[in-house]
C-alpha cells in the first residue's frame, strides 16, 4: 500500500496566531435566528388576519348579499376550505423536515437553512400572485418547505451557543417569536389588507425575508453544531494516516452500496433510535394535544372574538393581547425553568402545571358574557399557556444524543402539526359550520388542553436522563464508514 497525506511533525512548536474578535458573536447569531423565526410566524398571522383572510359573502333573509373581502371573499371559500388553506403549508413541512434533518449530517446545516429560506421567499411571492384557491394552496405548501429547513436546525444552534445557565432563556427568546410573530401578523395583515390589499402583505414579507436569505449564504455560525463535523473544512492529515486503496480494495469499493442508499440506512437507524426514547414519545404526545388547541386559537381566535363579543378591530385586540401575553409567558416559562434547575423531570412539572392552570383560565374566560371580563381572564390564561413554548423544546433537545437533535426537532415539528394544528383548524371550522355557535365551539376546543396537562404529568414520573452531552462511538463509527464509502466510491 502507498501511504499518502503523511507529514512530519514540526521541530519547533509555533506560537498560535492571535485570534481576532469575531463580529458574529453567539448573541448576534441568535438574534438573526430570532428575526427569521419572527418573520416566519408573521406569515402565519397574516394568513389568518381578517384584513388578509377576510370574510365570505353574506346574504340576509331578503336575499340581499354583501360582498366578501380578502382571500375568502375573492375566492369564495367555505370555512372548511379556509381552514384547509391555513394548513396547506404542512404538506411541504411534512415532506421536507426529515429530509433536511438527514441532509444536515452530510451538508452545512446553515447553508441548508439558506436553501429553505429561498424556497420560502419565492413561495410567499407566489401567494401574492395567486388567482384561485388551488394556486394559493400550492404556494402555501412550498412555504412549509422553507420552514422545514429552519425549524429543525435553529434550535440545536441556539442550544449550543447559549450559556449553560441561560439555555432556556435563550430558547425562550427564540420561541417568544412564535406568539409575537403571529400577533404581529394579525396587526400587520389587518392594516396592510385594509389599506393596500391582501396581496401586498405577502410581497412585503418576502422583501423582509430576502435580507436573511442573503445572510444565510454569506455568514458562518460562531459555533459548530455539537455532534456534527464541520462540513466546510477539510479533515486534518497530521494525526491520521490516509491509505490509498489497493486494486483488490478498489474492486470491493465498487460493490459498496450507493451514497443515497447509505444515507437512507443511516436515517432509518436514527429514526429507530429516536422513537425508542420513551421520554421523547410522552413529550411529543403532550405537545400534539397542546398544539391542537393552539392551532385553532391562532387561526380562528379573531373571528371567534368577533362572533362572541362583537369586538371591533378583533385583529388588533387579539394581536395586541397575544403579543404581550406571548412574550411574558414564553420568557417567564423559560426563566422559571432556568431558576428551578432544568432537569427533564422539573421541565415536565412546569409543562403540566402551566397548561392545567392556563386551560382553567381560558375555559372560564369563554364562559363570561362581559367582554372585559373575558379579556382579563383570557390574558392570564394565555400567559400560562405560552409558558411551555421553550421547555417543551428543551425536552426534545435534551432527551436524545446531540447528533439526533435535528431529527428530534424535525419529527416533533411534523407530528405536532400533522396530528395537531393541521386537523384542528378545518375541524374547528367544520364544527362551527354545524353548531353555528362560536362560544360552544371554542369551549369544546379549549377543554382539550386539560388532556395535554395530564399527558405531560406522566412525564414527571418517568426515569428521564439528560442525554445532550452523550457521545456515541458507535454513531461516529457508522458515520465514518458512510463517509468512507461515499468518498472511496469516487476513486473506484
Swiss-Prot record:
Modification Phosphoserine occurs at: 472
GO terms of molecular function: transmembrane transporter activity
Annotated localization: Late endosome membrane; Lysosome membrane
Transmembrane segments: 29-49, 83-103, 119-139, 141-161, 169-189, 200-220, 279-299, 317-337, 348-368, 372-392, 407-427, 442-462
GO cellular component: late endosome membrane; lysosomal membrane
InterPro entries: MFS, MFS_dom, MFS_spinster-like, MFS_trans_sf
Entries under Pfam families matching the protein: MFS_1
Cysteine pairings via disulfide bonds: none
Family classification: Belongs to the major facilitator superfamily. Spinster (TC 2.A.1.49) family.
UniProt function note: Probable sphingolipid transporter that plays a central role in endosomes and/or lysosomes storage.
Protein name per UniProt: Probable sphingolipid transporter spinster homolog 1
Organism: Arabidopsis thaliana (Mouse-ear cress)
